[in-house]
Amino acid sequence: MVKQASAWVESPLQMLCAVEAHHAGLLGPATEVVPRAGLRALRVTRRELRALTLPGGLELAAPRERMPSRVRAVGDAFSGKVQMRWLTSNPGRIVIVDDGLATIRLLELLAAGPYRPLLRARARPGRLRRALGLAAALRLRLSKVTVFTALPVTDELAAAVRRAGVDLVRHDFAWLRAQPISTQVPAERTVVLGTSLVRNGLVHRDQYLRWLTDLAAREPVAYYPHRREDPVDLALIRERPGITVHDEGVPAELTLRGLDPGQRVLSLPSTAITSLRVLLSPRGVAVEPVDVPEDWWTSRAAPALRSHLSSHLTGVTG
């Protein structure tokens, strides 16, 4: 009987990348992808993925409240629950899939040495949480770790990660690119990806809404919300003339891969820029990053964080 590997996923992107990791052969011949229960976006993404031809040996399990006792693949390496599972189960081999810009921070911490606690960029941990992050970092040093990513990684960082004993495997959504396109695309020429920067208190709401309003005054806009956008903000966006909000709840990589030549995607700093370029550039669709003007940032956005976000795109201002 073939032993089944488990992948624990907590976001739509993690779920998609777990499928890609299985397709790439990183998880063995049989994989069960287990979504965390209670998240509508995961339920919708699971439904959309099951409508496609999944790789052989892969099962998209029903959502569960609890993480499996042993997990081969995860997305959120900074999760306290994930780190506790690593410490209590001795996983041996770990595959970490993309989880947005947090993946880049993880690579930077792994490259910096074994005594850097695995903590989120804006975390203010207490002593116990810092100790858990440090213990998790040391556990990874004793395990075989693979980071599976579609994000751009500099040669310098990639070399440092590999010197630290971590395998870095790049991918270009090979499984998804091979799937037939059946989703209906928006009629609008311009598609805007929503952002979590406003809800996270990093970008001023008024400035962001003014930009959307000005953009929609020039042409109709299709707006695809970020899964963590504030419902109050979305209600305000829906009120703007010329903006159609498509509340899909699935990764942009799935929803927008069928855009037509001549359409374009605009986005504030987001890892979706990289993945959508992989999927859409061959179709003649422009994916245009939008630089965040200085007066958009709030005082909570420290200069280092602004640089970290902006360094992942070289763009135009809408």
Regions found by a protein language model. Name each.
Residues 179-182, 190-246:
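Redox- and metal-dependent alpha/beta enzyme cores, enriched for Fe-S-associated oxidoreductases
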Residues 1-10, 32-36, 69-75, 146-149, ...:
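Short hydrophobic beta-strand segments
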Residues 111-194:
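A nucleotide-sugar donor-handling region in carbohydrate enzymes
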Residues 76-77, 94-101, 188-197, 291-292:
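Short loop/turn segments at strand-loop or loop-helix junctions that form parts
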Residues 6-119:
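Active-site and donor-binding regions of nucleotide-sugar-utilizing enzymes
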